[in-house]
Design a protein with these regions (language model features):
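Short boundary segments that mark the start of a structured unit
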Residues: 1-119
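GH16 jelly-roll
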Residues: 71, 114-381
C-alpha cells in the first residue's frame, strides 16, 4: 500500500475589518485513500485573545480529501469584529480519519502587517453516488435461501472458515446452528422484515472446543457458496443494525484463496464504550497473505457530522462497496463515505454477514439482532 498522507493545519492571517478568515488544511502527499478531519475553533489566549460570539463565529466542521484531490483546502471562519493582533485557534478534534496527524493546531491572527491568507482554489471531486454497474449475480430470497453448518456450492455456512469460535479476537460468543445445538433460540431465521441474525446470552451454557460458552453469535458465510463470489463488482446490503452493548455486527469480504485479503464493508464495534450504533460506521481493508496481516487501512466515521447520515439501529439503511481495478469505494445509503486504492487486483471474494459477541456482561440491553431486508451482488468483468 502507498504511504498514508499526513494532514496538517496551517497558521493564518486576516485583515482587521474582514468578514472571513481562511485557514489552510494541507496534505503532504497525494492520498491513496479518503482522509477526513473534524475541525473546531478555540478561543484565543492572553491580552489579544479573540472570543467566539464576539470576535468570530464558532466553526465545527469536517474537511474531506479524496484520492486525486488537490493537497490544500481552506476552512472559512466568519469574523464578527476583530482588532489588530487579536488571535484564536483552529484545532483537530482527533487524529484525522484515514491519514496521519501533522500540525494539529493553527493560530489565526488579525494583522494589517502581513498578507491575508487566501482561499484555496482547485477542483475537488464530488462524492460518488452508488450505482449497480455490474450484472445481477445473486439476490437474497426467502424461497431460495439455504444454509448448513459448513455450507455448500448453493448455500451459506453458519460457521466461519476457522470454525465456530474466534478466541483470538477476544470474542465470547459461539457461532450457533440449531441443527448442531438443539434447544437454543434460533440464530438465523426469517422474520417479518427480512432475514434475522440473532445473538443471545444462552439460557444454558454450551461446552464446545474445551471451553464453556455463555453467549451465542450468528453468521452466514459464503466461502463455499459459488453464486456469492466475485472479483470485481458491487455488494449491497439493506439492513437494520443491533444496538446492544457487546454486539459486533459486520458485513465483510474475504479472499477465496484465504485470509487476508479482507474488505470490511460495514463494521460496528459495539463492544467499545465510545461506539454510537446510530452514527458510527467503520470501513477497513486488511492486506497480507498466508494468514498473516501486515497492514490494515480504514476509518471509523461519525457519519452524521461527515455526511448527514444516521439511525442505523432505528431503521433500514444501505451499505455497499464497489470493487474496481483501481479503487474500492464504500457507500452508505448511496453516498460515498470512503475510497481506497485497490491492492487486491486479481483476487476473488466471498461475503460474510455476522453479529459477533464480545462481552462478559448481562447482554440484555436493546437489540442484539441484525435484520437483513435485501442483499444483492453484481459482477463486473
Amino acid at each position: 500500500m502507498p504511504e498514508k498522507a499526513t494532514l496538517s493545519l496551517g497558521n493564518a492571517s486576516f485583515r482587521p475589518g474582514s468578514s472571513v478568515a481562511y485557514v489552510p488544511v494541507t496534505l503532504d502527499r497525494p492520498t491513496p485513500n479518503t482522509v477526513i478531519a473534524r475541525i473546531i475553533t478555540v478561543n484565543g489566549s492572553g491580552t489579544y485573545r479573540a472570543l467566539s460570539g464576539y470576535n468570530y463565529q464558532t466553526v465545527d466542521t469536517v474537511v474531506i480529501f479524496r484520492p486525486g484531490d488537490p493537497l490544500i483546502q481552506t476552512v472559512a471562519v466568519p469574523i464578527i469584529a476583530a482588532t489588530e493582533g487579536q488571535q484564536f485557534q483552529l484545532k483537530l478534534r482527533e487524529a484525522p480519519w484515514g491519514g496521519l496527524q501533522g500540525q494539529s493546531t493553527a493560530t489565526i491572527t488579525a494583522s494589517s502587517a502581513v498578507e491575508a491568507t487566501l482561499k484555496a482554489t482547485g477542483t475537488f471531486r464530488e462524492p460518488r453516488t452508488f450505482a449497480a454497474t455490474g450484472t445481477l449475480q445473486f439476490e437474497l430470497r426467502k424461497d431460495t435461501h439455504k444454509r448448513s453448518p459448513d455450507g455448500g456450492w448453493d448455500r451459506w455456512a453458519t460457521s466461519l472458515a476457522n470454525g465456530r469460535t474466534q478466541v483470538a479476537n477476544g470474542e465470547t460468543g459461539l457461532y450457533l446452528d440449531s441443527s448442531i445445538f438443539p434447544g437454543i433460540e434460533g440464530p438465523v431465521y426469517w422474520g417479518t422484515d427480512g432475514l434475522v441474525l440473532h445473538t443471545q446470552k444462552l439460557k444454558t451454557p454450551i461446552s464446545y472446543g474445551g471451553q464453556t460458552w455463555y453467549y451465542g453469535s450468528s453468521a452466514l458465510d459464503g466461502r463455499n457458496f459459488l453464486a456469492t463470489q466475485i472479483g470485481y463488482g458491487q455488494y449491497e446490503w439493506e439492513a437494520k443494525m443491533p444496538n446492544r452493548r457487546g454486539s459486533w455486527p459486520a458485513f465483510w469480504l474475504v479472499s477465496t484463496s484465504g485470509w487476508p485479503p479482507e474488505i470490511d464493508i460495514y463494521e460496528g464495534f459495539g463492544y467499545q464504550s465510545f461506539w454510537d450504533f446510530d452514527r458510527h460506521v467503520a470501513h477497513t481493508i486488511h492486506v497480507g497473505a498466508n494468514s498473516t496481516r501486515y497492514d490494515a487501512r480504514g476509518v471509523t466515521i461519525q457519519t452524521q457530522q461527515a455526511y448527514g447520515l444516521s439511525g442505523y439501529s432505528q431503521g433500514f439503511h444501505r451499505f455497499a462497496v464497489d470493487i474496481q481495478r483501481d479503487y474500492i469505494t464504500w457507500f452508505v445509503d448511496g453516498v460515498e463515505t470512503y475510497q481506497s486504492v485497490n491492492p487486491f487486483q486479481g483476487f476473488r471474494f466471498y461475503p460474510i454477514m455476522d453479529v459477533a459477541v464480545k462481552t462478559n456482561g448481562t447482554y440484555d440491553d436493546g437489540s442484539g439482532d441484525m435484520t437483513v431486508k435485501s442483499f444483492k451482488i453484481y459482477s463486473a468483468p
